């Protein structure tokens, strides 16, 4: 997020005392860069297997089993399977984690009786009440005292033995969340699956706190709930983390990523491989081209934060219509230095839905149907959000949200 909107923002200076992260950098997993195969393997065979180092105590066995899984992967496009349990009514019998894992495994690698179209099709369901929580869903608290890190959709085990784990985090105002915010994760998932050696094990929305000074910002608990409504019935891998929104002051993006690293890698020890050994999870920031361009503006982002975000974590950049992120990447010294840890995602179908324009449509009593999920539209109507707000013409015309 734009640091200049912090209420206590001061332009960064070389004499500024740096606040160390909660955990030392040595606790951030050091994985391979995110760059595509074609660049990473310029001097090696593209088809060469990528093996995760394992302890010697694990004997090599089940070769035939792993070979059959690999064949299953080749036949199907890499994707995070749709968990149909999410669409069961509250009265449905709760399944065990073993049952869920078995279902996901069968869906991932295919079976004789189930086709891909049956497992990935659009699910039909009725929403009787916005506050009716679907089966297996965890919603966020409204206070830091009651806060718990959401991990109900975070994979506990890697499915592909030749890939490394990755979690995607999107920071933003999400006022309101739109279909573009949802599509960004799907575009990132496709790019990572096709171009990298990583396996996505979860994705998070992290809405900013109310201290982020921007007109048109609904109260944080409304924005968190809208994000939950947008993804809890439509996704099997996206979650909403309210930690940033519950902070009493503006939280820098670098600190937000440190929070996810602490929760996933420090507290939970990472994720298990197919052998049962736990390894660290790479965490990456998902951002639009406008956020990256703000990183090039003088006296906005501290150099130390940029090095920390791009060097220790990495960034997935979704290009907007008309933007040229690659040229900007070439001209920015710090971003160019960490270019191997940045993956640019090109929109094959351009989508320029913006929260700013959605708020404008609502103020003008215009339809926002098909711009954001129906559950979010209903929530906005029930709570009369954005109806009586005003925004500067410059902000509306800028349309970079």
UniProtKB/Swiss-Prot annotation:
GO cellular component: cytoplasm; nucleus
Subcellular compartments: Cytoplasm; Nucleus
Family membership noted in the UniProt record: Belongs to the eukaryotic NMN adenylyltransferase family.
Matching Pfam families: CTP_transf_like
Pathway noted in the entry: Cofactor biosynthesis; NAD(+) biosynthesis; deamido-NAD(+) from nicotinate D-ribonucleotide: step 1/1; Cofactor biosynthesis; NAD(+) biosynthesis; NAD(+) from nicotinamide D-ribonucleotide: step 1/1
Enzyme class of the recorded protein, top EC level: transferase
EC numbers for this chain: 2.7.7.1, 2.7.7.18
Cofactor(s) needed for function: Ni(2+)
Source organism superkingdom: Eukaryota
Further comment: Present with 5130 molecules/cell in log phase SD medium.
Function: Catalyzes the formation of NAD(+) from nicotinamide mononucleotide (NMN) and ATP. Can also use the deamidated form; nicotinic acid mononucleotide (NaMN) as substrate to form deamido-NAD(+) (NaAD). Key enzyme in both de novo and salvage pathways for NAD(+) biosynthesis. Predominantly acts in the salvage pathways via NMN.
Residues that coordinate or bind NAD(+): 173-174, 253, 288, 290, 301, 320, 351
Protein induction: Expression is high in early log-phase and significantly drops as cells enter late log phase.
GO annotation, biological process: NAD biosynthetic process
Organism ancestry: Eukaryota, Fungi, Dikarya, Ascomycota, Saccharomycotina
Region spans: Disordered: 1-30, 48-123
Free-text remark on how the cofactor is bound: Divalent metal cation.
Known catalytic reactions: beta-nicotinamide D-ribonucleotide + ATP + H(+) = diphosphate + NAD(+); nicotinate beta-D-ribonucleotide + ATP + H(+) = deamido-NAD(+) + diphosphate
GO molecular function, one term: nicotinamide-nucleotide adenylyltransferase activity
Major location (coarse): cytoplasm
The entry's keywords: ATP-binding, Cytoplasm, NAD, Nucleotide-binding, Nucleotidyltransferase, Nucleus, Phosphoprotein, Pyridine nucleotide biosynthesis, Transferase
Name this protein carries in UniProt: Nicotinamide/nicotinic acid mononucleotide adenylyltransferase 1
Activity sensitivity to pH: Optimum pH is 7.2-8.4.
Keyword Oxidoreductase carried by entry: no
